[in-house]
């Protein structure tokens, strides 16, 4: 296994780079503990789901740099980056992560605003008569 595994995960407009090194289980996001960065329990669990699912939380130290978007997109990007790093460390984990859909890049993006309208789909009120 390589000393440092470097992977990228994206979600909406967020981009996360994960650096996986053998260690004792510390996870830092933008040089802050994960508990401090993702204060919301759900977003934290979503971000760390690949580690808990594969039961590898105590085997690796994870350093994550994430930028762009909001916390929801960032937690999704972190999750994908960690999942990709785990598959690079151990190919046997790919099947487990694949069944939980953690290796799939979520293609949903914000729909663009169209001209002549207020928002992407919202139209002005229509009057028949």
Curated annotation (Swiss-Prot):
InterPro entries: Ribosomal_Su5_D2-typ_SF, Ribosomal_uS9, Ribosomal_uS9_bac/plastid, Ribosomal_uS9_CS, Ribsml_uS5_D2-typ_fold_subgr
PROSITE patterns named among the record's database cross-references: RIBOSOMAL_S9
Name assigned to this protein: Small ribosomal subunit protein uS9
Entries under SUPFAM superfamilies matching the protein: Ribosomal protein S5 domain 2-like
One biological process term in Gene Ontology: translation
Organism of this sequence: Chlorobium chlorochromatii (strain CaD3)
One cellular-component annotation, GO: cytoplasm
Organism ancestry: Bacteria, Pseudomonadati, Chlorobiota, Chlorobiia, Chlorobiales
Keywords assigned by UniProt, alphabetized: Ribonucleoprotein, Ribosomal protein
Protein family (similarity comment): Belongs to the universal ribosomal protein uS9 family.
Pfam families the record matches: Ribosomal_S9
HAMAP family: Ribosomal_uS9_B
